[in-house]
């Protein structure tokens, strides 16, 4: 089996580079093919998915991301399949169990073993957010869930196809458990089609260069990345770093939740130890271990080698310690459907631990939360009682850098290449009117020599007779941190007006009526440096564009 520890094999360097890039572009082509064919806006518009190729042991070889937060889950999913199904065939397999190889039930992984002459050479993997997979709330993820059984359909490494064709009984089971069955199955079929593209590209390389040469190239890719990663780590600041923070609450209880990190960096290891963090909580913010590993990998790449390949060799020095039963490694039946709240903190803890050591690479704290929202129901405004759902992240303000203001209205660290859905797509396809999408200049921005970036304000007007709203926003009570005297950011929250009046940070399945208004406000990032040192020209610019939330100094 191919692993990063195998003996380095020398091959023609030109052929090697062609194959290396061929594998990367195969993953990328799979990624774009899925986006083009998908039915749900959360896939084709928001890009909440990822595609990858692993070796036959599940070691990540190449990955294409909409969501960097998936950097640690696809290889875990493959290893989980290998351990559960020793009898793997040339068929597609489907899974979404969070604890062993996932995130939350909405994120459905499909895996295709690449068999050649009876042997498994590689695995082709695709993970996408299905908008609806059952559960207690429309859209499936549930801020008020207290066990995984409330969050949707659990699929434990099931064989999805027979002879490459979706098994009718499995498909009917999936449809029966979805409030939007046509969208759900349409996205599943798009995943399968995109994976066939990647398989075809790999077999084309087999035909052109030879199977053994391609497999040797895989081994060398991982070994080269490992060597590069270790060389860069030697030049990276070493030491032990300690950080603590608090998550607002778990959506069930009001008490803040303590999280902590001890980060140890040596010549050949990058150890993130979350021992001492809270135990798994009653609410759905628990982060499965694969998601926690992803959180650490995201910062490692950003701080150590932003230009590295996303593969097992690059991540070789990383070790994550998260005690079983903790908020960063929950076990069944703890809910995980809004796992991103804790996962984002895992990223932020590592980020905060390193920022003083590598100030030119990392920023002050950002608004952090995915700020995920679901608006769904039955469309009796545009269409004849068809179900609809829009699931999306909400962008906000990033932290200031050592030499510049923070970026405004970007998605959080775990969401990377994802987008908030455009107003045009929403209004064309859903019974919703987007009445505002602007910078958040109403809440005072954080202050510093360099200020944090601004959040945003978005307003949705409900046009159907009824709808439901779910939202999960972190950093509402504990805003983004500043650095070197810079101020904190501002909170994230939502407001509802109309038939109900409400201001909050976490809610599941709130019933709304026609003309109700959902108002989403994300916060600013933290600032860098003493506000007294801010350049006067920058202050005047902020006043001119009304960035200061009404302040005059």
Regions found by a protein language model. Name each.
Residues 2-89, 97-116, 120-553:
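Glycine/proline-enriched, intrinsically flexible loops and inter-domain linkers
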Residues 92:
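Glycine-rich phosphate-binding loop of nucleotide-binding enzymes
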């Amino acid at each position: 089996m191919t692993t990063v520890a195998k003996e380095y094999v020398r091959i023609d360097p030109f052929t090697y580079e062609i194959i290396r890039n061929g594998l990367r572009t195969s993953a990328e082509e799979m990624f774009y093919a899925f986006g083009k064919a998908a039915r749900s806006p959360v896939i084709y518009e928001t890009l909440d998915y990822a595609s990858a190729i692993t070796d036959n042991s599940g070691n990540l070889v190449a990955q294409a991301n909409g969501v960097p937060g998936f950097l640690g889950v696809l290889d875990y999913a493959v290893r989980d399949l290998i351990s559960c199904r020793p009898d793997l065939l040339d068929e597609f397999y489907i899974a979404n169990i969070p604890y062993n190889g996932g995130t939350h039930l909405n994120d459905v992984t499909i895996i295709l073993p690449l068999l050649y002459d009876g042997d498994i050479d590689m695995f082709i993997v695709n993970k996408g957010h299905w908008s609806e997979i059952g559960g207690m709330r429309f859209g499936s993820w549930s801020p008020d869930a207290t066990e995984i059984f409330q969050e949707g359909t659990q699929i434990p490494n099931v064989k999805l196809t027979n002879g490459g064709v979706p098994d009718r009984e499995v498909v009917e089971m999936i449809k029966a458990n979805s409030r939007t069955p046509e969208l759900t199955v349409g996205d599943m079929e798009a995943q399968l089609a995109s994976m066939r593209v990647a398989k075809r590209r790999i077999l084309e390389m087999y035909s052109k260069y030879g199977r053994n040469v391609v497999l040797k190239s895989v081994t060398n890719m991982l070994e080269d990345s490992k060597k590069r990663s270790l060389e860069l780590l030697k030049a990276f600041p070493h030491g032990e770093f300690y950080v603590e923070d608090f998550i607002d609450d778990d959506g069930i209880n009001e008490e803040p939740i303590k999280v902590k990190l001890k980060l140890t960096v040596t010549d050949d290891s990058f150890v993130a130890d979350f021992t001492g963090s809270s135990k798994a909580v009653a609410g759905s913010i628990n982060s499965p271990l694969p998601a926690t590993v992803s959180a650490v990998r995201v910062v490692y790449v950003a701080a150590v080698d932003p230009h590295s390949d996303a593969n097992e060799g690059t991540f070789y020095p990383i070790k994550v310690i998260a005690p079983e039963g903790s908020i960063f490694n929950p076990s069944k039946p703890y809910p995980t459907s809004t796992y991103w709240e804790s996962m984002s903190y895992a990223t932020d803890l590592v980020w905060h631990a390193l920022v003083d050591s590598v100030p030119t690479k990392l920023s002050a704290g950002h608004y952090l939360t995915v700020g995920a929202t679901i608006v769904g129901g039955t469309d009796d405004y545009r269409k004849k009682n068809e179900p609809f759902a829009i699931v999306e992240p909400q962008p906000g303000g990033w932290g200031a850098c050592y030499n510049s203001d923070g970026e405004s209205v970007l998605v959080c660290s775990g969401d990377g290449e994802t987008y908030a859905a455009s107003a045009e797509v929403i209004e064309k396809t859903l019974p919703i009117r987007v009445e505002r999408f602007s910078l958040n200049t109403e809440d005072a921005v954080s202050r510093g020599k360099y200020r944090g970036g601004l959040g945003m304000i978005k307003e949705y007007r409900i046009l159907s007779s009824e709808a439901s709203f779910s939202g999960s926003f972190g950093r509402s009570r504990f805003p983004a941190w500043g650095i070197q005297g810079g101020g904190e950011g501002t909170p994230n929250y939502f407001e509802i007006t109309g038939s109900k009046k409400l201001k909050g940070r976490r809610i599941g399945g709130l019933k709304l009526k026609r003309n109700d208004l959902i108002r989403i406000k994300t916060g600013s990032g933290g600032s860098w440096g003493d506000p007294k040192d801010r350049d006067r020209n920058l202050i005047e610019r902020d006043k001119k564009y009304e960035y200061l939330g009404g302040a005059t100094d």
